[in-house]
Amino acid sequence: MLGKLFGKAGERPEADAHALPVPRGRRNGTYPVRALGDTRVLALVEAADAGDWDGVKAALAPFDLGRDHRVLGELADLDGVQDWIGRAVEQDTEHRATALLISGARHIAWGWEARTADRAVNVTREQWRVFHERLEIAEEHLLLAAEARPHWVTPWCRLLTSARGMSLPDDVKRTRYEAALRRDPLDLETHLERVSQLQPRWGGEPGEATRYAREVFTGAPEGHRLGCVVAMAHIEDWVESDSPGCLDLPYIQKELRDAARHSILHPAYERRPGWQQDFNMFAMALSLASESVAAPQVFHELGGAYTPWPWRYMSQPEKAYARFRRHA
């Protein structure tokens, strides 16, 4: 049955020579994805964790940091990078743009660590001060990186995040959004950031983000990960809603099912490092919608692989993943 619904029955993607082995003795049959599930990314993370700038540069060779948001994200989320990346910015003229990009991305994540994910009314004055101080450094470094490498899309996408955090004017956000899309009109992370900006908690109107996601998705080629924008828009709607069952509607179930088939479940979808996060977005959205056709296929393809995003919206993310997986 699943073969008829999703394509060639029983056919799985070819084994990835760089895939990290699945951990043994998995609790609930699930496991957190480490370093995007890729041995090359693990080498990058280990070099960065050791403060080895030469090792970081060598490990970055297979990747295009100006376009690969997920690889950049591994460095941005790594505690301690802020302690040594400034020296690379100052001393390595040849690779300064790369160092600036990493520093900018790290300072955004580091800033949000100071602010926390709490509601704005619960953030202290000191937390706000540190948050803005770190975002100002991020802004400076990302703008310099964008100037040095005009074809890069990742600095502009990260500048959208810092603009949201600093509550910059809408025209600034629009300029950065357009700059990112000029470099890659189908850039998923840019569109996901726009979905976040359009949420009521960030000044948007109810339903605006979902309408935007639908419009964006109409231009997505078959097998393109841009379909995730639909899944994430519905997850954001769930976050904003007071009703836990707000997505449990037939038309939403169908919309998510169609988006999954067109993107991550399509044979043309390319499983690059971190592909598990795309599947986790759909796994969460389909589960919240109580969808029963595509959800089992998505969880099956994941094989228990869990990514914190977007499950961190739940109080016990990994337990929620395991529960939905068990009932899919």
What residue ranges belong to the model's regions?
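Extreme N-terminal leader/anchor segments
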Residues: 1-92, 296-302, 306, 310, ...
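Alpha-helix N-cap/N′ positions at the starts of helices
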Residues: 39, 137, 172, 277-278
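Short coil/linker segments at helix-helix boundaries
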Residues: 62-95, 106-183, 189-222, 227-258, ...
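Carboxylate/His-rich catalytic cores and anion/metal-binding grooves
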Residues: 103
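Hydrophobic side-chain positions on well-ordered alpha-helices
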Residues: 47, 107, 286-287
